[in-house]
Regions:
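Core subunits and conserved enzymes of cellular information-processing
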Residues: 2-180
Length: 180
């Protein structure tokens, strides 16, 4: 392997991890701007964590870490190591960024979207869904995922490879969305 091809490989890895970190921060920002301000829960494990935050005032960031840590370990054991590392980077970055935003260490409250009555039942969930959908797609294209139900779906897909991964993710997330 030549020096040029090694440096291209390193640059590619740096760009991949930079993108994963960026989209994880984008997801945390989306939670702060749309989800928390309008009191709704998105799909997935973080949707469950959001419902717990609303009821028990236990931060989604901490709950996400508690749920994703063992899932990331399982991913490292049973699935592709690169996928596991990238997913762990996403999950850690999301939680840290969310903590920084929730505790106003980085105050971006001026960006928050809220209607006059205090909640948006259509635009905020729609905007959040579009943004998070783009983030999910980007994460999957980078051989990563956003954690939670995506990891559970990947583990199910490993056990039953004839099942379509995207349909498994859809089914799990739909179940959580209906529960919220």
């Amino acid at each position: 392997m030549t020096k040029v091809s090694k440096s291209k490989g390193i640059i590619k890895k740096v760009l991949i991890y930079f993108t994963i970190i960026s989209i994880a921060c984008g997801m945390a920002l989306c939670y702060q701007i749309f989800i928390f301000e309008n009191s709704f829960a998105p799909a997935g494990i973080n949707g469950i964590a959001t419902m717990i935050q609303y009821k028990l005032h236990f931060s989604v960031a901490y709950m996400s870490l508690l749920i994703n840590a063992p899932l990331c370990v399982l991913t490292f054991i049973f699935l592709d190591k690169s996928f596991a590392v990238r997913t762990t980077v996403f999950a850690l970055t999301f939680s840290v960024a969310l903590l920084l935003l929730q505790y106003k260490i980085i105050d971006l409250s001026f960006l928050s979207y809220k209607t006059d009555n205090g909640t948006s039942t259509i635009l905020a969930p729609l905007a959040s869904g579009v943004i998070n959908g783009i983030i999910y797609g980007a994460a999957i294209r980078l051989n990563s995922c956003t954690g939670g139900t995506d990891i559970v779906a990947a583990l199910i897909h490993k056990k039953w490879p004839e099942q379509n991964l995207l349909w498994i993710i859809f089914a799990l997330n739909t179940g959580v969305a209906i529960a919220s």
